[in-house]
Amino acid sequence: IEVNARLSRSSALASKATGYPLAFVAAKLGMGYGLFELKNSVTKTTSAFFEPALDYVVCKIPRWDLSKFHGVDRELGSSMKSVGEVMAIGRNFEEAIQKGLRMIGQGMHGYVENKELNIENIDESLQEPTDKRIFVISKAMHKGYTIDQIHDLTKIDKWFLQKLKHIIDIDEKLRKCTSVNVLDKYLLREAKVYGFTDFQIARAVGLEEEIHNMYKAGLVIRNLRKNYGI
């Protein structure tokens, strides 16, 4: 990340994400020890002279509590307005971002299948960086906005937009299932691999409207997964 004599928030995140004890190792190095002399805190036998190898993706998302303060400007800029952050881990970016969005305390179920946002002008909402903009992007993609259009309005890198569009594509395939009975195991497995919860799947196939109970709807999908061995 960078070379300095202190432990920053970024290096603390890197330590949590990799499982490598940066603070402990940095303190020992400052005392004159070499990396080859320090023991790996996990194995207790090998040295700390190794590079962590990750087979997962870590996503850090700031948490804002702007709704608690009346009249506050929701636009985000260079001044820090976040009151904390969440760290989500997944085998792919789609899974990690959906997990993170569920944890930021805005009452969302992930990137898709959330409560409907009342947006008067999608273009303006995409241009203004706010704590809700990622959900505006989700709505825009459902409305048919292309990756290039959203990139021009938000200036967000297309790699991230392509990953978010992948979640939308899976959601659209789920919505084409008229009932849970036509939901095949391959689509169900794909949805679970990319971070969809049982409730998100249930809402996408219209099961929540049929049962009128979100918890029971999620349990139906859970039992279906068990039958499929997923």
Briefly describe each language-model feature range:
Residues 1-195, 219:
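ATP-dependent carboxylate activation and anion-phosphoryl transfer catalytic cores
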